[in-house]
């Protein structure tokens, strides 16, 4: 798409032959009958200042908004919801805004991943319990995207996803800064004594300059791109910076389009096919996307009943190199990516590898949506013939340490560490690790492998982003900036380094990671997709017999429900009672 975003409103077609009738609308059950209950519903709408012509015979569109005062990735979504509603009204729909939980990555503790499924449940039940015919999903910050989509899948009404968009580029003393990625970088410089407290305080004011999501290829940017690539957003939507005037135009176009989608009954089930997921994974690899995407994509696919696992990511990773020269795998930022042509241009570079027949929310195919898209800055978006990195964005390793797999981002690691054998320094929990890495007398070299336990879905709990373990301060002062680190936790998509993550099964449930001890040796071979703990089966059995599971963190409340029902990383970390396609009856109206 162009930098102006005008293509978002053009070329969208709608087949009148398949149009629903007003009496077929889901909302008609609430509003269309002549009984006492429908009388009450209509009376309450009039209480809100509406007249019958505002809603009669029109699709009711639920605008699910994850705006919050403490989620600055979504600061603008209060205004953008009005843009969406403007579009809905223009197209002959009746918009109603429904606020939902806002998962602010910086502020929600211990981890937003603890609450992804809660938001998914909220989104599904908001849509089910209200007279909603179609949904516009406003999200962006990391877990909001998969959560909203998972909820919409399970509900099954037509839905379109509106991405919050990335921040403007950060800037400090004339250097462009990326939130997250450069924070980690300069934190190590501060720990090494190479920048002052004054420098650090000044950087704090320049690394995040506007509303919007992290402007590197973190989890937010990755998941917004995946939503577009799988067909749930308008073409080019995921690349638009949050502060750009093209963004409200995209929002109103999404509002217009969802009305037609309701008449067409164009649901996520008709869009999110196995081929569409393959397209999304190919885009993820070419973008150098976040490792977190594996968990979210698997969870979304399982909501649809699709047999999908981490192995498919690895198969595609071996085929698709990194084309987006965006941090942390490259040098540029998301604003640069937008002006270079954005996701449509990158997908057009990938078109020989994509299934161009996949349907999207436009009612057109992916092939039609990306036709003619150009790359304007070839150093930002590379061709397949000259990639940024031939190492895939994500590698899935297996072995006796991770029988069900673990993941790594080879494109963001020092190449010398992609094949490595070293002695282990093991930490039982995050607090122990945080203390030990700051010790100047820690017995550690750059060849050691740091192992963190109890950071998984149950052990964290919520699988916090602890996986980019800090380089020990002693080594940072020596100039070391990467080493092999292994955990059952996740890491921020803005992070980088030779971090092996999502070890499954996790240590808390008795996975092999629980039995690793300081002094053991681990061997990693990314090319061979192998990870091996050099400890005999007999010794591992002895350690297993002596092992005791840590006490549960939550004796009651949502945390207890989470701990009882959460799946492992390779399963998408969904609740066992949310997966699958078993239909739920429509609510009775009394």
Language model segments and positions:
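Short, well-structured alpha-helical segments in soluble
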Residues: 118-130
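N-terminal amphipathic/basic-hydrophobic helices that include classical n-h-c signal peptides
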Residues: 1-15
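A short, small-residue-rich loop immediately preceding and capping a beta-strand
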Residues: 128-148, 159-164
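Catalytic or ion-coupling anion/metal-binding cores of large enzyme and transporter domains
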Residues: 14-69, 73, 80-100, 106, ...
